[in-house]
From Swiss-Prot:
Gene designation per UniProt: UL128
GO CC annotation terms, alphabetical: membrane; viral envelope; virion membrane
Predominant subcellular localization, coarse grouping: virion
Organism whose genome encodes this protein: Human cytomegalovirus (strain Merlin) (HHV-5)
Parts of the chain that traverse the membrane: none
Subunit architecture: Forms the envelope pentamer complex (PC) composed of gH, gL, UL128, UL130, and UL131A. The pentamer interacts with host NRP2.
This protein's record includes keyword Membrane: yes
UniProt-recorded name of the protein: Envelope protein UL128
Recorded superkingdom: Viruses
Keyword Membrane in record: yes
Signal sequence extent: none
Family indicated by similarity: Belongs to the HHV-5 UL128 protein family.
Classification of source organism: Viruses, Duplodnaviria, Heunggongvirae, Peploviricota, Herviviricetes
Amino acid sequence: MSPKNLTPFLTALWLLLDHSRVPRVRAEECCEFINVNHPPERCYDFKMCNRFTVALRCPDGEVCYSPEKTAEIRGIVTTMTHSLTRQVVHNKLTSCNYNPLYLEADGRIRCGKVNDKAQYLLGAAGSVPYRWINLEYDKITRIVGLNQYLESVKKHKRLDVCRAKMGYMLQ
């Protein structure tokens, strides 16, 4: 049978199906009130709803942003990146395995990649505290410290105690 001959048959079969039993994926419902005036403050969680509406959970309650503000959704969510916990980020997309998430322009999220812009990453550290270690400096510091200790012991004429503490077998 050609695809043209199957079309009426498949259409009739589709109409005969009981659509009440077909599982449907429903978008999460958002809160009823839409915020239009002030930016969110101290919000700690967000969810994407139907028609690109974003709902933020804040201490004052849930604040929603309407579909007309889709250009701002990315900016709205990124304002709260410092207050998102690692667990909240993980619960958004568990397949990312605690790695940062990337926020698309329309509010969708995906697992972050190495070359993504850092300003749109959720769950990434803004800066990693570090300390440069100069190995030569560490050796010199250790030698200087030992020499200072030896000099202080020599003043007190307790060189034998110093040798024992430092583990040297001086003869």
